Amino acid sequence: MNIAEAEIIVAGGRGLKKAENLEQLKRLADLLGGVVGVSRACVDAGWISASHQVGQTGKTVCPKIYLAFGISGAIQHLEGMRGADTIIAINNDPHAAIFNVADLGIVGDLFEILPMLIEAIEAKHNGAK
């Protein structure tokens, strides 16, 4: 699916720390029926292709839900995702610029929060079967 057409985007930034950590984002995106988006830092680091990049030098997106994990909120990135209906940001820096545009901001460790979200959604999916 083209990221610009996605209704749910699970996005990550430099706070992911390494390419392997994108796997959890992909898992959450799959569970939610969404796609993975990233900040320029992830593309520049070679972790993922530019087709997933959100921002002025990437794609402009307007999803219903934009989940941002470890994205500080550089103006170039924010410009690409401001059209989202609901922005949920998770960052360990309480002063991260992403919180200025987020509808819901969670100050916390994405490496604790992301696995808990995945587990809760998997449990709900398994209970619904």
Question: What are the roles of these predicted feature ranges?
Answer:
Residues 1-129:
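N-terminal glycine-rich FAD/FM-binding segment characteristic of electron-transfer flavoproteins
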